[in-house]
């Protein structure tokens, strides 16, 4: 698409409509905004309640996490995100040598949180988590066994795999004939590893005991998904085929679709015909990704299900207060210097 450009793509727009309808193509648009992805990686490294005991369970394992990520967003700038990304992507065997860098990053975030976070409870949760990390930097989840596995295009490929699984479930397809990806030497192996991992998870879920599946199906983070999606049913179980040499027509069509849709979303110049095509594709596409807008959308979806404060009965209020105070006592007993 980039080689053809607007001038040579515009004349084939009618053919693209015809081909799309005739072949009944399913189009998915999945994206990652890199600054937001770096922010989410920082959140995962610091606020994992399974590693950082100062983080309340609900602040990590429920959609309440989206409030924390949004608050964390107000504390970072481009330089801090670069530092955080470097610490998240360093190989894990080297992370011990970066402990001072982790402490410096968290100390800067703590200083900003003390003055920028207006909500008292949010400020308390964030500063407690940062204080724990400053005291125990190597207990956090910085570093990775393989930087390629958390590269944006490999993570985004997981959205693609879930999209393929969704189509298979909807159309009742038992096995895809072929899954072809474009040639990306350093990432194709990681893409196949991601596919194999998700397929293996699906197989494991299928063999799990009913009570184990029940825990997963009732998890707060899974409320918006149906049972088949949660259990990863339909995940591609054939090895990826990497396009070799001249890209096949399917890869070329995907490239054209993505090029046009990217330019529509980024408000870049297009002919009226191509712009109409892009809008038409996006309206019918499966659409998901990692960006601040999508994170806020997920929070708002959850918030709509919550009762208003005045609708909570006295037992619910007492339980909420007790949960908060019990956690405060546990944090105070940690002696993390707050």
Locate the predicted segments by residue.
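Active-site-surrounding "flap" and adjacent substrate/cofactor-binding loops of secreted or lumenal enzymes
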Residues: 1-4
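A two-mode feature
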Residues: 14-17, 21, 30-338
